[in-house]
Structure formats: structure tokens, C-alpha cells
């Protein structure tokens, strides 16, 4: 929100300079991003009138002018501007003036003709571009001799206020002024009288509000018989420009001016272009509308529109249609001033690639009781400038759907609890009265009702924030911390998340943080069987679904980096995923990662290879090795929609799936925007947050026996199944089983494979006997045969 300081000071005028005003606004939560002067420094430039213009005797492109600058005698100025004519009002830098760039005006002779000053264009004074090739033309009623800085209010400053979404009430000069008045405890004064414009004409335009939830209030009236040549006054154009908008024509400028002044967006239709009744309704699927920016839209059924008998004429609260726009030939106007519910506007502008000042305000919320005042103000300005006859008001109001402020209880002890300081009851009441709240004292504190424009007030904490803002956070005394200071401790069996993250960083991963909201279509493709939540008011359509997995965010990060020539990527993220079962929302902490590209960074040896499934499995096993379930988690082949059917596995713990990993399905590579073979994993954090308690154990001093066994098994049998079978052998001397070969080929049937294992056998307290070792080997062979039908090769 760009705020003209001089305009603001017409409403409220604290005894603060510009910098102090900006600082106080920032401390009160209206953060000031910057302060810009409306014009650079220059001196001795006045309003002048060109009396006569004659051609220069020795220069075809120069003119000799006589100029009235408000002195006793006119001055002669040689001028090269193409648009200089007798009778015009212009900006004149007198002798002694200093223009931007330290350009000093002196008496001079141009081609032998004396020149005592300089007639200036807008660019020479550092003023906004007026689109004129030549002199900056001033209004005919500009008083000759007046200092230009005073006449155009060029000592004004534009304060850029960055508002948070909940402070939509400050998207106007009046809104910011209300806060300044409360903060500074100074009077708030409206600089214009509340005038009710005479409405003696008959309104032939009927209005039918079909969707009363989306539009609980619609006001309008016709204006005709006005001066169609009337132009926007320079003071109004100036204020509109300083707010960051461009003047268009009188009608549009007045609606924009009222929006900037009071915060109520408005729209004006060419009444002669409207056919039949105005209807406020939802769009019919695939209806067309050409907007004012000449963009044809195909409307969706969830879009609120203003329509006539021929179809839509405006996107409600967003932008008007070209088919009903006001032009230089318009003789009858229909002014619309409505209240649109935020839920009916949120996201609709972005849905069509639009963002307007109107949608910006309606999305955040506008005072439901402001349209009456705003319409009267617009009609007052219009009739004062252009005259005309105003019809009676057309009003369609559904009181039940209007936001009604509710009383909120405020307790003194809660103020102390949240702000850390006790504020006198009288001061609390004074603060809320300055904020225009209705204050009622009761046994437990106060019942406070916010004014209609403060629809962000919902709970007690909101009220306490207001107390802190207006009292001044910088006025809160410093207090010592009251809580006992002690370092948090974890049981020895629990490990902190940062250790898990550090383990991945040590393996070459980079940590990322992605949004919890993802594209609905992509999520459905990746996890079609998992119920998910959708946001009612998403930031954008591609951030509508709450993630059920970390994979969409990880893949978007990979896509972003691959487009920037980063081909070797190893990333991980820890966070919540959201699912919905039996009408209940579940939030599960998980950790996930992704790898793609070469295994190692480029190095001088030139030896490298692409990552594969087993590289990722090694990363996952590193995390499992930190936990107490390292030996209990099993990797079992399975199929997920997101993974390649032959390159995926589930992590199974006690019969439950606690994680999954695999290669991204080739059919999803394009829609995910990535290239190459991407490998992903995700597991529940709870699985690895409990670790083994370290226990010292002496190393056996006695010889270790190693025996190699090769088993022939079914070719489809996972190796883990064979290892699990051997694990069922009850023995204290079997220390480890390691795979050293898997073979398929000559001597083995096509439907089988050979798995070669090394068994490490050792007793803790004595040397083993051959009989003990042989007995163990027999048990291993027997278990392998019983459980997986393995034959000793």
C-alpha cells in the first residue's frame, strides 16, 4: 500500500516527522518498506503563462516567448519545445533556479537572443512521465507565480507500507489514518463532509442477486445528463499516481480514488450496453468473457460473475468486461458498489492469471458496511466535477450473510500472561476506545466488540495483540526470564533428529525444506490409494492438496536444479505428511530423500558410475543402523504406483510397512519434470528415533572359524528370505552371515540361482571343537531347506 503523506495528514496529523511516522507505523505492525520523495530537489520553479510565441530569427527549431511568471514584467525565454503555444500554463525555472542534477539556470543568449529562464518538461524536473513530447502542461486555472513545489505538493513523500494479510482494513488512506490516530493518540478527522447526493431520477436498472452468500450486499444507481467532456482534476490524478495507479478517465479515476481513500472497490458500467437485469450469479461452465485488458476468459462454474441477459459483463470483485466498459461516448453510467464475500473471490483472480487492486482487497476482506458510504462519496465527487442526474438507489441486501462483529471476552490476567506486563484497566479501555471498539466492563474483564472493519478480531489473543501494538512494544519493560533454566535431556535410548539429519549430510546429502501443499494431480499419480486433504483457500491451484508423502517436493527440487545444469543431486527432507482416515486427520513425522546422477562428484581419476537402487539401500541402512530396529527391519519387494515395478521395496517392521524406496516409475518422469533415473526413499521417523543403548562387550580371544556354503534356491527368492531362515538357528556361536556371491548360469537351472554365504563361527570363552561347528552347519542346512527349500550346492 503506497501512502501519500500529505493525503494521510489531511486525515490525521501527529507531531511526527516523516521518519518518525514511518517508525511508529512499523512498530505498530504496519511495516514500512521504504520512503520515496515524489520529486527530486529543485528550486525557483514557478507556474507561468506563455503570453506570446515568435519564431527565432536565426534558428528554425527555436521560439522566442514572452512569459508571465508573476513578476512586474514578463520575461523573455528562448524555447525549443514543439508544444509551446500562447496562452498555455507551464513550469518555468527562473534565473537562479537549480534543477535536478545540479543544473543551474542563468541568463544566457541563444543564437544571439537573450533568454532569462527555462520552460521545463516533466523529465527535466524529475516528474512522472506525462506522455507529452515537450513542455509539461499545467491546468488552465493554475495560479501564475505560485511555486511549483507548493502547487503540485512536490514536497510530499510516498510511504510504502507492507501489510500482512489480516490487516486488509489498512488498504486505504482512511484505514492507515485510523491506526495512526490510535497509535499517536491524536484526533482522526475525515476531510470531507458526509453529503447525501440528491437522487431524484428513476433507476430503470433492476438487479437480481442469485448467490446471496457470495454477494450479500449489492448497491447501484444510474447517472446521466453529466458533462461527458469533464476531466479528472489534477489533484485527483496526482493522488492516484502516487498510490501506484495510472489515471484513465473521470469515471474510472473516481472509482479508483474512492477505493484508495476508503478501501471499497467499485465498478462502473456503460448503462446503455447492459441488456436486461443485472444478475449476480455463478458462471455457467465454458461461458466466455473478454475482460478490460482484452483477455478472453473461459469461465469455470465456481466463478462469481456479474451478468446481464446476454451473459457475463464482469468478474465479480476482480475486473470488468470489455462488453460493458465505459468510453468517451458513454452518456449513461451505472455505478456498482457491492460487498463480495472473501471465499467467493479467493483464488479466482489467480485462476485466470489476473491480479487487480479490487481482487487484492476482496480476497482479504472489505468492511461489509462500507458500500453505502463509498457510493455516496463517489457520487459526490462525480456530480461536483461533471454534474449530472442521479437515480434512486438499487439495493439488494441479505443481512444474514453479512459479517456481524461479535463480543470477545478479554481478561486482565491474560494480558499479563502474554505481554509480560500489567497494564492499568483505564489504559486498556482507553486503547480500545481509540481503536473504536465497543467496551463493556464485566466481572472477569471486558466484553469487546470490534468495529465492522476489524473482521480480523476473532479470539482473545487478537485483542491482546492490539493492546501491545497501541501501548507500544518498545514501551514494554524488560523483565528477567521467570522460567527455570535447565538443559533439556533425552533418555539414553532416544536420539535427536539432528543426528539423523547429520548422518545423511555426512553421506553427501543436502537438506531441503519444501511446501506441505502440492499439486493435486501429481499427488494422485504418486499415491492414488492414500486419502488426502484439500485446502479450501489454496495459495494457488498447484498447491491445493496437503502432501501424503515428501516425494512431490523432493521431485520439484530435483527438477528445479536439473534445469540449472545440476545433474548430481542428493537431497533429503524431514517433515510431516498428512492423511485422512475415518474422518480423522493424521500427521506423521517422516524423513525422505532422493538421489540422481553419478555416485561420486567428478574427480581426477575419471572413475564413476550412475547411482542405483543399492546405493540408496545403503543410505537407508545407515539410518537403520542408528536405531534399535536395525536387525528387525526387512526389505521386501513390493509394488507402488510411484515406483518402477522391479526396482522397489517396502521396509517391514513387525508386519507393518514403515517405509518405502525405489526408482521413480518411468511413466512419471515426464510429469514430475525430472530426467534420468531418480531413486527415492521415505520412512517413519518414529522407526529410527529410538537407538540402542551402548553396551561394552569384550572381544573373544579365541579363534574364529569360517565356513562357506552355497545354496541353490528359486530364482525369484529374495536373498533376505534365506538370511531370515538361517537367523532362526538358535546358536550363541554363529556370529555373522555374509553373502559373497550370487550366481546364475551353467550348471544351474534357469529357474534357480546359487547364493554363496560365509558363516563366521566363534565362542566367547573357549576354542570350538569340530563337532560343534559341524553340528551348527547341519542346523543351518536344515533350516534353509525347511523354510525356503534351499539345497546345498
From Swiss-Prot:
Q: Where in the cell is it found?
A: Cytoplasm
Which PROSITE patterns does the protein's record reference? B5, FDX_ACB, TRBD
Catalysed reaction(s)?
Answer: tRNA(Phe) + L-phenylalanine + ATP = L-phenylalanyl-tRNA(Phe) + AMP + diphosphate + H(+)
Which Pfam families does the UniProt entry name for this protein? B3_4 (PF03483), B5 (PF03484), FDX-ACB (PF03147), tRNA_bind (PF01588), tRNA_synthFbeta (PF17759)
Which GO terms label this protein's molecular function in UniProt?
ATP binding; magnesium ion binding; phenylalanine-tRNA ligase activity; tRNA binding
Q: Which InterPro entries match?
A: aa-tRNA-synth_II/BPL/LPL, B3/B4_tRNA-bd, DNA-bd_dom_put_sf, Fdx_antiC-bd, Fdx_antiC-bd_sf, NA-bd_OB-fold, Phe-tRNA-ligase_IIc_bsu, Phe-tRNA-ligase_IIc_bsu_bact
Describe the location of the FDX-ACB domain by residue ranges.
Answer: 700-793
Alphabetically ordered keywords of this record: Aminoacyl-tRNA synthetase, ATP-binding, Cytoplasm, Ligase, Magnesium, Metal-binding, Nucleotide-binding, Protein biosynthesis, RNA-binding, tRNA-binding
Q: GO CC annotations?
A: phenylalanine-tRNA ligase complex
Regions annotated as coiled coil: none
The cofactor note reads:
Binds 2 magnesium ions per tetramer.
E.C. designation(s): 6.1.1.20
Q: Give GO BP annotations, semicolon-separated.
A: phenylalanyl-tRNA aminoacylation
Give residue ranges for domain B5: 403-478
Q: Does the keyword Cytoplasm apply?
A: yes
Among SUPFAM superfamilies, the record links this protein to:
Anticodon-binding domain of PheRS, Class II aaRS and biotin synthetases, Nucleic acid-binding proteins, PheT/TilS domain, Putative DNA-binding domain
Q: Which residues form the tRNA-binding domain?
A: 39-149
Report the transmembrane regions from the record: none
User: Any idea which positions bind Mg(2+)?
Assistant: 456, 462, 465-466
Q: Cofactors per UniProt?
A: Mg(2+)
Instruction: Name the NCBIfam families on file.
Output: pheT_bact, YtpR
Q: How does it assemble?
A: Tetramer of two alpha and two beta subunits.
Q: Member of which family?
A: Belongs to the phenylalanyl-tRNA synthetase beta subunit family. Type 1 subfamily.
What's the protein here called?
Answer: Phenylalanine--tRNA ligase beta subunit
Source organism of this protein record: Hydrogenovibrio crunogenus (strain DSM 25203 / XCL-2) (Thiomicrospira crunogena)
Higher taxonomy: Bacteria, Pseudomonadati, Pseudomonadota, Gammaproteobacteria, Thiotrichales
Amino acid at each position: 500500500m503506497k501512502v501519500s503523506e500529505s493525503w494521510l495528514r489531511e486525515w490525521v496529523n501527529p507531531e511526527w516527522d516523516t521518519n518518525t511516522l514511518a517508525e511508529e507505523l512499523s512498530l505498530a505492525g504496519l511495516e514500512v518498506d521504504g520512503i520515496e520523495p515524489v520529486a527530486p530537489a529543485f528550486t525557483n520553479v514557478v507556474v507561468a503563462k506563455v503570453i506570446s510565441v515568435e519564431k527565432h530569427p536565426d534558428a528554425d527549431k527555436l521560439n522566442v516567448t514572452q512569459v508571465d511568471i508573476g513578476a512586474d514584467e514578463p520575461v523573455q525565454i528562448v524555447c525549443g519545445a514543439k508544444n509551446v503555444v500562447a496562452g498555455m500554463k507551464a513550469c518555468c525555472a527562473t534565473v537562479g533556479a537549480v534543477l535536478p542534477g545540479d543544473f543551474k539556470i542563468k541568463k544566457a543568449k541563444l543564437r544571439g537572443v537573450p533568454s532569462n529562464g527555462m520552460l521545463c518538461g516533466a523529465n527535466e524536473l524529475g516528474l512522472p512521465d506525462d506522455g507529452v513530447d515537450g513542455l509539461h502542461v499545467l491546468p488552465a486555472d493554475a495560479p501564475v507565480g505560485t511555486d511549483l513545489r507548493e502547487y503540485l505538493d512536490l514536497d510530499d513523500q510516498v510511504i510504502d507500507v507492507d501489510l500482512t494479510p489480516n490487516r486488509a482494513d489498512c488498504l486505504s488512506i482512511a484505514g492507515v489514518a485510523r491506526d495512526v490516530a490510535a497509535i499517536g493518540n491524536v484526533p482522526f478527522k475525515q476531510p470531507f463532509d458526509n453529503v447525501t447526493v440528491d437522487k431524484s431520477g428513476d433507476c430503470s436498472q433492476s438487479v437480481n442477486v442469485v448467490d446471496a452468500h457470495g454477494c450479500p450486499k449489492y448497491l447501484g444507481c444510474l447517472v446521466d445528463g453529466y458533462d461527458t467532456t469533464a476531466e479528472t482534476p489534477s489533484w485527483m490524478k496526482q493522488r492516484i499516481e502516487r498510490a501506484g495507479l495510472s489515471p484513465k478517465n473521470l469515471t474510472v479515476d473516481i472509482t479508483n480514488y474512492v477505493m484508495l481513500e476508503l478501501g471499497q472497490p467499485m465498478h462502473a458500467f456503460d448503462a446503455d450496453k447492459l441488456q436486461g437485469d443485472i444478475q449476480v450469479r455463478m458462471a455457467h461452465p465454458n461461458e466466455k468473457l473478454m475482460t478490460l485488458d482484452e483477455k478472453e476468459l473461459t469461465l469455470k462454474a465456481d466463478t462469481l460473475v456479474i451478468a446481464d441477459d446476454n451473459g457475463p459483463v464482469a468478474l465479480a470483485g476482480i475486473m470488468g468486461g470489455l462488453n460493458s466498459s465505459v468510453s468517451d461516448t458513454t452518456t449513461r453510467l451505472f455505478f456498482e458498489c457491492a460487498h463480495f464475500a472473501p471465499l467467493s473471490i479467493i483464488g479466482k483472480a489467480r485462476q485466470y492469471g489476473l491480479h487487480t487492486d479490487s481482487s487484492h482487497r476482496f480476497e482479504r476482506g472489505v468492511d461489509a458496511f462500507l458500500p453505502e458510504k463509498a457510493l455516496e462519496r463517489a457520487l459526490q465527487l462525480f456530480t461536483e466535477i461533471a454534474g449530472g442526474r442521479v437515480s434512486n438507489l438499487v439495493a439488494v441486501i441479505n443481512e444474514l450473510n453479512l459479517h456481524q462483529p461479535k463480543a470477545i471476552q478479554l481478561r486482565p490476567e491474560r494480558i499479563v500472561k502474554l505481554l509480560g506486563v500489567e497494564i492499568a484497566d483505564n489504559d486498556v479501555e482507553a486503547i480500545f476506545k481509540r481503536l473504536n471498539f465497543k467496551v463493556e466492563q464485566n466481572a472477569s474483564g471486558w466484553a469487546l466488540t470490534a468495529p465492522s472493519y476489524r473482521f480480523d478480531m476473532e479470539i482473545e489473543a487478537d485483542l491482546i495483540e492490539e493492546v501491545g501494538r497501541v501501548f507500544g512494544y518498545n514501551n514494554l519493560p524488560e523483565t528477567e526470564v521467570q522460567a527455570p533454566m535447565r538443559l533439556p535431556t533425552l533418555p539414553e535410548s532416544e536420539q535427536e533428529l539432528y543426528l539423523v539429519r547429520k548422518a545423511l549430510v555426512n553421506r553427501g546429502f543436502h537438506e531441503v525444506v519444501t511446501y506441505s501443499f502440492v499439486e493435486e494431480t501429481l499427488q494422485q499419480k504418486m499415491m492414488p490409494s492414500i486419502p488426502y486433504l484439500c485446502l479450501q483457500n489454496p495459495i494457488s491451484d498447484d498447491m491445493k492438496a496437503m502432501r501424503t508423502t515428501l516425494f512431490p517436493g523432493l521431485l520439484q527440487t530435483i527438477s528445479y536444479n536439473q534445469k540449472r545444469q545440476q545433474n548430481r543431486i542428493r537431497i533429503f527432507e524431514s517433515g510431516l505428511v498428512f492423511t485422512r482416515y475415518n474422518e480423522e486427520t493424521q500427521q506423521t513425522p517422516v524423513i525422505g530423500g532422493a538421489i540422481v546422477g553419478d555416485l561420486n562428484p567428478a574427480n581426477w581419476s575419471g572413475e564413476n558410475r550412475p547411482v542405483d537402487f543399492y546405493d540408496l539401500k545403503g543410505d537407508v541402512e545407515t539410518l537403520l543402523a542408528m536405531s534399535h530396529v536395525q536387525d528387525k527391519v526387512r526389505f521386501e519387494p513390493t509394488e507402488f504406483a510411484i515406483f518402477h515395478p522391479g526396482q522397489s521395496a517396502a521396509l517391514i517392521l513387525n508386519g507393518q510397512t514403515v517405509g518405502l524406496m525405489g526408482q521413480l516409475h518411468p511413466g512419471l518422469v515426464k510429469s514430475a519434470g525430472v530426467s534420468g533415473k531418480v531413486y527415492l526413499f521415505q520412512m517413519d521417523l518414529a522407526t529410527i528415533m529410538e537407538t540402542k543403548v551402548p553396551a561394552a562387550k569384550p572381544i573373544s580371544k579365541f579363534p574364529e572359524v569360517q565356513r562357506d556354503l552355497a545354496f541353490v534356491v528359486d530364482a525369484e527368492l529374495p536373498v533376505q528370505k534365506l538370511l531370515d531362515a538361517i537367523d532362526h538357528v538358535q546358536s550363541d556361536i554363529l556370529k555373522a552371515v555374509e553373502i559373497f556371491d550370487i550366481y546364475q548360469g551353467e550348471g544351474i537351472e534357469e529357474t534357480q540361482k546359487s547364493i554363496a554365504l560365509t558363516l563366521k563361527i566363534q565362542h566367547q570363552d573357549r576354542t570350538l571343537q569340530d563337532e560343534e561347528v559341524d553340528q551348527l552347519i547341519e542346523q543351518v542346512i536344515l533350516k534353509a531347506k525347511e523354510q525356503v527349500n534351499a539345497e546345498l550346492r
